[in-house]
């Protein structure tokens, strides 16, 4: 029974964090608070790139050698 309780709590916590209510790293600014620099793409991978780099210029990101997710490229029509 305890395992079931733990599992439910873990799933709820994971979905809460995934919804963006809690940033994965509280020290970093959330994408909807301030436009974050393109380096978030490189640090956090494709999921965070969509959130943090939505206002990011793809050409600038590519020139700086940052990773840009395919989802972001689709949004910018590339």
UniProtKB/Swiss-Prot annotation:
Q: Does this UniProt record's set of keywords contain Mitochondrion?
A: no
Give the GO cellular component terms, alphabetically: extracellular region
> Which residue positions does Glutamine amide occur at?
76
Propeptide at which positions? 22-26
Hey, what's the signal peptide range on this chain?
1-21
Does the entry annotate any disulfide bonds, and if so which pairs? 38-49, 41-53, 48-56
Q: What does this protein do?
A: Probable neurotoxin with unknown target. Possibly targets ion channels.
UniProt free text on domains: The presence of a 'disulfide through disulfide knot' structurally defines this protein as a knottin. The cysteine framework is VI/VII (C-C-CC-C-C).
This protein's name: Conotoxin Cal6.3a
Which source organism does the UniProt entry give? Californiconus californicus (California cone)
């Amino acid at each position: 029974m305890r395992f079931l309780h733990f599992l439910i709590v873990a799933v709820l916590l994971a979905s809460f964090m995934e919804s963006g209510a809690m940033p994965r790293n509280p020290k970093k600014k959330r994408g909807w608070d301030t436009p974050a620099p393109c380096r978030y793409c490189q640090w956090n991978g494709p999921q965070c790139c969509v959130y943090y780099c939505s206002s990011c210029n793809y050409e600038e990101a590519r020139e700086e050698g940052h990773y840009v997710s395919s989802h972001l490229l689709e949004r910018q029509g590339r």
